[in-house]
């Protein structure tokens, strides 16, 4: 049987689609973190101590990497929410080229809230 359309690898995946998928994935990730954290609150002390000991036995670089891995989706989702508020207020910004540019910008700008949260955690611990 002959293929009707060419293989999907020839198509360029648009940054706007990647941004949309990442926004949905970060929302699911945040939900998972929330559920995991609440589950941890209801476990016995031995389980909690294992998690705490694991974290506190990491060196500073490992803690920073782990914190960033956990916090980046929060920063991304927050920044994406701000972007949608801006679009709601200024609909003329919703052109294809501006949406693509803002999607690229969003991936970079999300680092700022991640670093701010990371610094807050470092100061608390």
What role is predicted for each listed range?
Residues 1-125:
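Membrane-embedded alpha-helical bundles that constitute the cytochrome b-like, heme-associated redox core
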């Amino acid at each position: 049987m002959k293929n009707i359309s060419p293989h999907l690898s020839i198509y360029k995946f648009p940054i706007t689609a990647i941004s949309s998928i990442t926004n949905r994935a970060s929302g699911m990730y945040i939900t998972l973190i929330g559920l995991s954290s609440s589950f941890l609150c209801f476990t016995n002390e031995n389980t909690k101590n294992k998690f705490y000991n694991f974290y506190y036995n990491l060196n500073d670089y490992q803690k920073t990497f782990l914190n960033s891995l956990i916090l980046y989706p929060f920063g991304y989702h927050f920044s994406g929410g701000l972007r949608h508020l801006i679009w709601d207020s200024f609909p003329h910004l919703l052109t294809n080229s501006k949406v693509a540019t803002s999607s690229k910008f969003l991936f970079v700008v999300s680092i700022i809230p991640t670093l701010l949260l990371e610094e807050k955690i470092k100061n608390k611990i």
